[in-house]
Every structure is written in structure tokens, then in C-alpha cells.
Amino acid sequence: MEEGFRDRAAFIRGAKDIAKEVKKHAAKKVVKGLDRVQDEYSRRSYSRFEEEDDDDDFPAPSDGYYRGEGTQDEEEGGASSDATEGHDEDDEIYEGEYQGIPRAESGGKGERMADGAPLAGVRGGLSDGEGPPGGRGEAQRRKEREELAQQYEAILRECGHGRFQWTLYFVLGLALMADGVEVFVVGFVLPSAEKDMCLSDSNKGMLGLIVYLGMMVGAFLWGGLADRLGRRQCLLISLSVNSVFAFFSSFVQGYGTFLFCRLLSGVGIGGSIPIVFSYFSEFLAQEKRGEHLSWLCMFWMIGGVYAAAMAWAIIPHYGWSFQMGSAYQFHSWRVFVLVCAFPSVFAIGALTTQPESPRFFLENGKHDEAWMVLKQVHDTNMRAKGHPERVFSVTHIKTIHQEDELIEIQSDTGTWYQRWGVRALSLGGQVWGNFLSCFGPEYRRITLMMMGVWFTMSFSYYGLTVWFPDMIRHLQAVDYASRTKVFPGERVEHVTFNFTLENQIHRGGQYFNDKFIGLRLKSVSFEDSLFEECYFEDVTSSNTFFRNCTFINTVFYNTDLFEYKFVNSRLINSTFLHNKEGCPLDVTGTGEGAYMVYFVSFLGTLAVLPGNIVSALLMDKIGRLRMLAGSSVMSCVSCFFLSFGNSESAMIALLCLFGGVSIASWNALDVLTVELYPSDKRTTAFGFLNALCKLAAVLGISIFTSFVGITKAAPILFASAALALGSSLALKLPETRGQVLQ
């Protein structure tokens, strides 16, 4: 009996050992399968876990960052690293095994970062509850961020710079191009849209400013959300809002609905600049960041060139239109508005193929997601360089301890909108708190200085770039008025006028039994004249007025001579029949003036190309501050040449000069803003500063254009003073060249 019992016990122990070994191997196979499924970016059947038979050839690592660097002690003991096995004492798989994440108790011995620098703690010491209850001190969090920044920079160097970054460059370039297009759309369509929508001068002014107002709101909104919800997600939503309402604005008929659509379109595109620069910078190593962010700025110029070229090619084609009665009209300028939404639509489609920023994942404690994205970057670049066999060696990356999370409530608590309301309030509170932290003791001085630089730059740049075309139009008007023909005291009887009268003044004339049929009047004025027994039929006019005139027994049939065109005039026994329908306001429509707007904008945006190239090549060589201050000083000097601009050609040349030298300061300012703030505040601060930029633009445009036709001294003085102040403030900012991204 006793011998049989011993045999039975031995059999049971052997069965348990076999079952345990089978379970172990089955678990490893499952993990390998998961790793291959998750490794969709490398497109090769490579597993990060070595076969057990190969353990002697590939010893397990002793730390949590690299493979293939095991210790002799582990080999002799027959033990495998938790970083590669992922089993506890009971042979259970723990969460994160497939990512190669070391267990907490295994990370305390000899952990090191990707560049070999020592690093204390387990799993970054961030999620195991160390530190005082209720959160740790700010000094500890600052230390964590510095360690993460150093390790992240080393990982980006290992990933290299190649196909992935260039693909992302063109994708984000489309989003930046959409922002450049948005700035020009309203200005290009106004000469045509004012007739269809019957826009007064105040309506046109509001339409021009509403876009900047929308972009100001959008920059602050999407910039704040991108630090909480993610760069890619917020950029997709903001571009979707822009494209949807840009599409609607091409079809709506009323001024109010068009204004509303352009406002929301501006809100959508407002998130483009803050998110795009922050997003792209987090995939760039330190030695590439300044140059490639400057190359990215070129897409804003391409957006302006695209808008000007499309306006030139589409709007003058009046045949590209249709109408359904008098209620609905779709003219060529609406086609232009539709075409201007294409960059945003294409950017949305391309952005869906790109991953979220790994730096955002790490800042929010999402280690596994960040690892997968960085592995995608590494494998994409290595395949493109002809080294597909190179393996991404990093297995563990530091993450930041999260002290606050979005409030979650049970699904059966209240209604769905109450739950969403709670989450929205929580998110809004976090965004606002993050914004206020930009004015905390650590960043208050930087933020205030950056506010001054952004405001002065935007005030002078946008003010002058809008003032230039207005000055050109004023010079055109002065030249046009100098060629006005005056006909005094003429007497005309029994004559039929069926041609065009343009740029003429008729004073003291007498017209008896005359017929004005199919006549077109453009910038014609009749003063102190008499019309008796005359007949007006199918007459169209623009900028035409009858001042102190008398009409006796005169008939007006199917004309657009509305009441406001008769200034202090008397109509005795005169009749108006079937007046033309449409806008009763006097609009100039499209013509040479509109072509000049397209041409000037095209040249002005194209002129920044040399400045873009120079700034990109020198950004990492001379530094951000020297580039910003030097370009601002050169822009300030170029302002003094404006006093010599007394002709159209001279003003166009000065516009190109100013744009060419000022673009370098904008590029440097964008790079500096990205590098001065940490990753958890980057888009929030950038969005706020960009919103301030749009506010300064509105003020600059309003002030500068008020001096058109009065004096050139005031705009020159304001712009020069603002640029000088901005350059002096810029020199007091810290230089960020050569620093890792915080």
C-alpha cells in the first residue's frame, strides 16, 4: 500500500509539472501571436521574444530598456528576465508582457535610459505609488520630465530621420496650407460677393474681420484641448469643422448665414498652426528640429499662392455659374470658395494614416501606445534606408505620473447628456487650469515676454500686409480720377445713347428728347443738368450719380437708377417702370481692381520663398533669437522705404521686400514657442499666443487702414515702433538651440 501511494504521489507531481510546462509554453505562444498582431507597422514576422532553446545564445536583459544584454548571473541561474518572459512566481502572465515592460520589482537593479544614463526607480518610478500621499512635489515631477526628455531625445536619434518624418511633413503641410488659404478667401471673394449679397461697407468690414475672430477662438480652444485629448485627434476634428463649414459657405445665399459659416470655418482652422508645429516637433530630434519646422512654414506660403492662383483662374469665369430664378444664384466665386476647402479635406484624409504623438502618450501615462508609435517610426525609417533587419531595441520608456484624470461616472448615473456634461466640465476645468499654469512662477516671465513679441509682430505684419493693397487701390483711384473727362454746358437733342460712358463729368448740360437705351454708365456724374422728355431703358450703372439735376416728363424703364443715385435732384412728372431687381447698393463688381488684388497677393506670398529658405538653412546654425531679432530689425528698416512708395509698382516691390525679410522672424518665433514650453503645455501656450496674434492682427488692420489716403507716416511709425519693441523683447528670451524638447 505504502509503495503504491508513493507511486501515485509521484505520478500526480509529474502530471502537475507537465501541465505547468504546457501552460508556460502555451502562454508564450499566445504572447508571440499578440506581438506579431500588434507589430503591423514593421510588416515582417519578427518577434521580440526569443525561443527558449535560444536562451543561451540570446541571454535576457537585466534592465528594462534594451534586449540582448543579459548578465552572467541570470544565465547561470537559468532564469529569464521579466522583461522578456512576463511571468510571476505562479507562472501567470502580467499585463504588458507583449510590450516587454519590466515588472516593478525587476526594475530597481541597474535600469538605464536609451543613451546609457542612469535612471532610478521602477517603470520610471511613476505608477507604483511612491512619494507622499495625494501626489508628489513639483520638484519630483520636474525631475521626471527632465529624465523623460533626455531619454526621448535618445530614442528619436535611434529612430533616425527619414521616410516617416517626411511623410508626416507633407501631411501636416496640407493642414498648414489650409490655414494660409483661409486668410485670403474672404478678401478674394468680396469684389464678387458684394453684388450677390448686397454688402454695405460695414458688412464687408465685418466679413473681413470675422475670419480672424473665428481663428482667434479656434486657436485657444483647440490648442488647449490638444494637450488633453491628443494632437492628432484635435487636429482631425478642427480640420473637419473647417472643411464642413467652408463647404456650406459656398452654397448659402444670405449674408448672415455666410458670415456664420465663415466664422465657424475660422474656428476650425484656428487649431491648425498651434497643433501642427507641436505635433511635428515631437517627432524631430534636436539637430533637425529648427530646420524642418522652418521648412514646414513654407506650406503657409504655398496656401497663399494656391488661393491667389485659384482666384485668378476661377472667379473671372462668369460662365461657371447657374441660378434658379431670382432666389438662388451660384456664381464663379462660390466655386472658388469650394475649391479652397480642398487642402483641408485632403489633410483630413492623409492625417487618418498617421499615428498620435508618442510624446503625448508618454505625458499621459500611455507607455504601450507610445512604444508602438516609436517602433513604427524606427521600422519605417530603417526599411527606407535599406536596413529592415535592424530591431527597435528600446523596451521601456519613462512615463509621467498622472495626478488628475477626467471624471468618470457610472453609465447608469443620470442621462447621457448629464454624463457628457460632467465630463465636459471636467475637461474644461483641466484645460483652463493648464492655461493658468502658463502664468505660474516658472513660466510667467517667458509667457509675458512671448505675448509682447507675438503681439508686436502680428500688429505690424498683418497691419502692413493689408495696408499695402489698400494703398495700391488708393493710388489707382487717384490716377483714375486724374484722367476724368469733364464736359461743361453741352446741349443734346434727339440723340440715342447706346454705348458706354466711363469716368466722365457732365456739368450744366441740357438733354431734350434723348434716348438712353442699353447704356452702361461707369463712374459718371451729371451735375446741374436738365433732362426733358427723355427715355432711359435697360441702363446699368456703377458709381454714377445725378447731382442737382431736374427731370421733366422722363421715363425710366428696367434700369438700376435707384433713388439714392439722385442727389438733391427734382423729378417732375417722371415715371419708374420695372426697375432692375437685385442689390440696390452701388458696387464696383469685378474688374481690373480685383485682378490687381489677386496679383499683389500672389507676388506678396511668393516673395517670402527666399526668406523661408534662408531661415531654414540658418535656424540651427545662428540660433532662434538671432534669427528673430535680426529679421525684426531688417523688417523695421524696410518700413522706412515705404515713404518712397508713390506708385503701384513701387508699393508692390516694397510689399515683396517686407514679406521676404519678415518671414524669417515668424519661422524663428514658431520654433521658439514650441521649444520654450513643456509637452503638457505646448499646444495650450501656442494656441493662446496665436489667439493673441489674431487679436493684434484685427487691431493692426483697423488702425492702419484708417490712414489710407490721409498719411503714410502714421502706419510707418506704428509698424517700425512695434517691430523695434518686438526685437528688443526677443533678445531677453532664453535661447533654445541645442536643447532637448521639454
Swiss-Prot record:
An example Gene Ontology molecular-function term: transmembrane transporter activity
Extracellular side: 191-205, 255-262, 316-334, 469-598, 648-651, 709-712
Membrane-topology annotation of the record: Multi-pass membrane protein
InterPro entries found in the cross-reference section: LD_SV2, MFS, MFS_dom, MFS_sugar_transport-like, MFS_trans_sf, Sugar_transporter_CS, SV2
Name the record gives this protein: Synaptic vesicle glycoprotein 2A
Modified residues (Phosphothreonine): T84
Quaternary data: Interacts with SYT1/synaptotagmin-1 in a calcium-dependent manner. Binds the adapter protein complex AP-2.
Biased composition range(s): Gly residues: 122-137
Disulfide bonds: none
Disease: Developmental and epileptic encephalopathy 113: A form of epileptic encephalopathy, a heterogeneous group of early-onset epilepsies characterized by refractory seizures, neurodevelopmental impairment, and poor prognosis. Development is normal prior to seizure onset, after which cognitive and motor delays become apparent. DEE113 is an autosomal recessive form characterized by severe early-onset recurrent epilepsy.
Family as reported in the entry's similarity comment: Belongs to the major facilitator superfamily.
UniProt keyword Nuclease, yes or no: no
Post-translational modifications: Phosphorylation by CK1 of the N-terminal cytoplasmic domain regulates interaction with SYT1. N-glycosylated.
Function, as annotated: Plays a role in the control of regulated secretion in neural and endocrine cells, enhancing selectively low-frequency neurotransmission. Positively regulates vesicle fusion by maintaining the readily releasable pool of secretory vesicles. (Microbial infection) Receptor for the C.botulinum neurotoxin type A2 (BoNT/A, botA); glycosylation is not essential but enhances the interaction. Probably also serves as a receptor for the closely related C.botulinum neurotoxin type A1.
Annotated segments matching region Interaction with SYT1: 1-57
Taxonomic source organism: Homo sapiens (Human)
Residues bearing the modification Phosphoserine: S80, S81, S127, S393
Composition bias, Basic and acidic residues: 33-49
Keywords attached to this entry: Cell projection, Cytoplasmic vesicle, Disease variant, Epilepsy, Glycoprotein, Membrane, Neurotransmitter transport, Phosphoprotein, Synapse, Transmembrane, Transmembrane helix, Transport
Residues bearing carbohydrate: N498, N548, N573
